[in-house]
Structures are given as C-alpha cells and as structure tokens.
C-alpha cells in the first residue's frame, strides 16, 4: 500500500484524491465520479447544513503532457465519507491509513 501524504493548505489538512485512488485501488476518474456524486447529493439536500467544502476542495494538477486535470483535496471528513463507502480489506486499510495520518497531526 502506498503512503498517504498530508497536504497543509487553506488552514487545514488534506489528502490528494490521486493518493486516495491509488491506496484504494480505484481509477482516479472513478473516484472523481463518486466524489462528484456525493457533492451533488449534499448540494441537493435541503435537510442538511453540510457544505461540501468541509469534505472536498476542488483542485487540479498538471499531468506529464502539461494538461491541467481535476482532482480533489479530501479533509478528514472527506476521507471518512469515502471510507464509509468501501468494503472489505481495501476499506479497512484505507481507513487505518488516513486515521493514522490525521491523528499524527493532532
């Protein structure tokens, strides 16, 4: 399993969605699709006061050809949301990895 790296930015701590995708064995564009679905549900719900930016921050990166591509920065709550949708060994390992990383910062 690859190491999760904490990114300290915007006054918080985050993990890049590319790292999350690699750790959970999911293609990055599939994880982006899932995150976009979570965001859509949160935005459409009138029963909650959740701002999706508490979970996911839109970001981007440049690939090896110089193209700018989308990614997300996941807060601890964003990691928890992704982890709660996973099952089996990958879910357990990802949960253990992000909990350890964020707890190291406290």
Question: What are the functions of these language-model segments?
Answer:
Residues 1-106:
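An anion-engaging/catalytic patch
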């Amino acid at each position: 399993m690859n190491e999760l790296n904490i990114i300290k930015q915007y006054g918080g701590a985050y993990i890049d969605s590319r790292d999350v995708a690699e750790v959970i064995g999911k293609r990055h564009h599939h994880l982006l699709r899932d995150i976009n679905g979570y965001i859509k549900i949160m935005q459409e719900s009138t029963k909650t006061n959740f701002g999706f930016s508490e979970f996911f921050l839109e970001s981007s990166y440049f690939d090896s050809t110089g193209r700018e591509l989308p990614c997300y920065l996941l807060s601890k709550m964003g990691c928890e949301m992704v982890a709660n949708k996973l099952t089996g060994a990958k879910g357990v390992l990802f949960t253990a990895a992000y909990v350890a990383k964020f707890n190291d910062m406290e």
